[in-house]
Swiss-Prot record:
Record-given protein name: GMP reductase
Gene3D superfamilies assigned: Aldolase class I
Active site positions: C178
Keywords for this protein: NADP, Oxidoreductase
Family the entry assigns: Belongs to the IMPDH/GMPR family. GuaC type 2 subfamily.
């Protein structure tokens, strides 16, 4: 590992501006290439039950955004691939690593239901089980782009890439509804951005930063540290279209948001590493995506460039936990 003393997180970093070369931020190009596809934003909503469902996946794909469907209604996945392909859209699904998931991978391969993207999605992705799953997918569906995770070390990134992963997802428990760090003592909570930097340095393929994103500026910071794509949970939760339950408290509307290993999601009290919270209702998801795009265009203009590559070259300073001056986000 790198120097373990020089760790930092999103709130510790400020990017330093360069001379602006565009007349308006609307000229800035926020698009990103992943595999054989180009997407409108370097952002993907988290593949969680309270963030994405079939309808949202379809809307995102139609509008040119990347998405990853969650794996918590396993029996619907084959039909989902079929429907997306029938509509001329890309299919991007999640799988686990157990025997029944391997059977599912064999089944869709045999039926020629080949998704463009598969994300192997487990909490501790630096595992033999993940390596075996990558190898199985690549053997049966060599054209499918495989994202594997989640990991938090350069060693893990190298191993998963060597096994055949096309991208790795970095982040162990830094998310708002993830309590891995509390329950286990392990994780990248508090130093997620440093983990992204170290992992991206070791990577020869794209890295997806996953977790700990609290503001749109954090997306720009992730790209500066080497992420190709940024997975966002809580910022995408609690919208009009979001799957979570709407709850009214004292005249204000809230929506449920829970972690992928929470008892609410698992329906049990076993191996719980997630919690449930209520977030204020946020209006339309399309409005949030537009605002994200505009903020990222502003970031590019501050970086002195015309596209996302400008963000990878800016200088930054470490200002330990002080950019909020004690204010909560």
């Amino acid at each position: 590992m790198n120097n373990l003393n020089s760790v930092f997180d999103y709130e510790d970093i400020q990017l330093i501006p360069n001379k602006c070369v565009i007349n308006s931020r609307s000229e800035a190009d926020t698009s990103v290439k992943l595999g054989n596809y180009t997407f409108k934003l370097p952002v993907v909503p988290a593949n969680m039950q309270t963030i994405i469902d079939d309808k949202i996946a379809e809307m995102l794909a139609k509008e040119g955004y990347f998405y990853i469907m969650h794996r918590f209604e396993a029996e619907n996945r084959a039909a989902f691939i079929k429907k997306m392909h029938k509509d001329g859209l890309i299919a991007s699904i999640s799988v686990g690593v157990k025997a029944d998931e391997h059977a599912f991978i064999r089944e869709i391969s045999a039926e020629a239901l080949i998704p463009e993207f598969i994300t192997i999605d487990i909490a501790h992705g630096h595992a033999d089980s993940v390596i075996k799953t990558i190898q199985l997918i690549k053997r049966l569906m060599p054209q499918t782009f495989v994202i594997a995770g989640n990991v938090g070390t350069p060693e893990a990134v190298r191993e998963l890439e060597n096994a055949g992963a096309d991208a790795t997802k970095v982040g162990i428990g830094p998310g708002k509804v993830c309590i891995t760090k509390v329950k286990t003592g392990f994780g990248t909570g508090g130093w997620q951005l440093a983990a992204v930097k170290w992992c991206a340095k070791a990577a020869s393929k794209p890295v997806i930063a996953d977790g700990g994103i609290r503001t749109h500026g954090d997306i720009a910071k992730s790209i500066r540290m080497g992420a190709t794509m940024v997975m966002v949970g809580s910022l995408f939760a609690a919208h009009e279209e979001s799957p979570g339950q709407t709850v009214e408290r004292d005249g204000q509307l809230f929506k449920e948001y829970f972690g992928s290993a929470s008892e609410y999601q698992k329906g049990e009290h076993k191996n719980v590493e997630g919690k449930k919270i209520l977030l204020p209702h946020k209006g339309s998801l399309k409005d949030t995506l537009k605002e994200m795009e505009e903020d990222l265009q502003s970031s590019i203009s501050y970086a002195g460039g015309r596209d996302l590559s400008a963000l990878t070259k800016v200088d930054y300073v470490v200002v330990k936990n002080s950019i909020w001056n004690g204010d909560a986000i």
